[in-house]
């Protein structure tokens, strides 16, 4: 079906969300779809599979294909640091083009708790209020992570500087490796600021 659709509508942008392994997705099952799908959205749990990582790297070398990573926990007690703030770090280190969550905002679908601040039935990071969205603390933690990456980006033009190059070679990986330490991203920012001050004098 996917092959027929892609051949019938060659200019269409087909995307696929590859859920966690318990949905039965594996590198072997995903690979046949690669020639026909323009955007591949991977659940973050899939990155624990070396075969998926190898396939992901192959997809990322193909011109015109987009890769993204998403999370979708419905647990209101997910750790703000490891689950939300580090989500952008995980996306950047794994070379994804974009990141997301299964649901951005909870909506009034008649379900109990659909707009209840005490529940997040589909892993949403904002709440709906009439025609507006109200950010949750989860959204603010995600924004912290996005800002962390902006500090990283600010250093990229200075990679010819040996100190900056050495920092960028090890520091980002350390943030994810030591994810039990919520102060790691703040230390990264502080060091990035020091380097930027020195480099932009």
Which role fits each region the language model picked out?
Residues 1-31, 111-201:
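Catalytic domains of carbohydrate-active enzymes that cleave complex glycans
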Residues 1-112:
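Catalytic-core regions of glycoside hydrolase
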């Amino acid at each position: 079906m996917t092959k027929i659709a892609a051949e019938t509508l060659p200019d269409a942008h087909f995307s696929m969300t590859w859920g966690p392994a318990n949905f039965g997705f594996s590198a072997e099952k995903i690979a046949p779809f690669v020639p026909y799908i323009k955007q591949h959205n991977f659940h973050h749990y899939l990155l624990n599979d070396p075969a998926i990582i190898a396939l992901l790297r192959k997809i990322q070398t193909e011109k015109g294909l987009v890769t993204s990573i998403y999370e979708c926990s419905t647990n209101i007690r997910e750790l703000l640091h490891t689950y939300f703030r580090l989500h952008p770090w995980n996306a950047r280190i794994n070379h994804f083009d974009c990141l997301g969550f299964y649901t951005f905002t909870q909506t009034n679908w008649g379900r109990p708790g659909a707009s209840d601040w005490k529940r997040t039935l589909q892993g949403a990071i904002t709440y709906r209020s009439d025609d507006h969205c109200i950010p949750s603390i989860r959204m603010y933690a995600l924004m912290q992570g996005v800002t962390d990456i902006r500090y990283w980006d600010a250093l990229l033009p200075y990679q010819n500087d040996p100190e900056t190059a050495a920092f960028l070679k090890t520091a980002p990986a350390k943030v994810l490796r030591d994810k039990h330490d919520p102060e790691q991203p703040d230390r990264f920012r502080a060091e990035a600021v020091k380097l930027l001050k020195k480099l932009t004098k």
